[in-house]
Amino acid sequence: VSWVKQPKYYLWVWAFCFVMALLDVSFFRHLFAGFTDDSGAGYLIFDSADESVYLTGFRLDFIIYSAVPIIVGYYLIFKRKVESERYRFIYNLYVLTNSVWLLCMYASYTNRIAYLSWQLLPIVLIYPFLNERIYASQYRTGALIALGHLGFTLFMAFVYY
């Protein structure tokens, strides 16, 4: 089915999941909790009065971190017309797995769910700059994006937390 390969549909799914996260719709956390055992459900459904709960809530820092490759991929696919089927597959997979995290964002230890998409993050950012002909200074741009990503990651790890 050709529409399954179109990134715009995955972006619509991500936007829907973002709105659900913004509105704190708990339906999806309860739905996902039904698929797991009690310990897994405990992460998704928690008592907000419990002070031992990991930092939860609307994580703007995580959303910014996750949105950067979505924005870069959007620019490359729709504005620069990168036609690589492999890149579109990796990009769509990243957007889809990140969408699942958005639905569970208010759960405890949500970064464990986000890691499923974040492992693809460097590939989504760098792959087209190494394997596609985009423009003359693409290697420099790719290196700057990689350094920016590394800098933000180190900032979040050592300064922010």
Whereabouts are the PLM-identified features?
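Hydrophobic transmembrane alpha-helices of multi-pass, membrane-embedded glycosylation machinery
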Residues: 1-4, 118-123
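Alpha-helical transmembrane segments and terminal signal-anchor/GPI-anchor hydrophobic tails
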Residues: 2-113, 159-161
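Helical transmembrane-bundle signal
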Residues: 98-101, 124, 149-153
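Residues within membrane-spanning alpha-helices of integral membrane proteins
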Residues: 91, 95-98, 121, 143-147
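Signature aromatic-anchored transmembrane alpha helix within multi-pass, membrane-resident enzymes
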Residues: 135-155
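Short coil/turn helix-boundary motifs
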Residues: 106, 132-136
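Transmembrane alpha-helical segments
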Residues: 72-73, 121-133
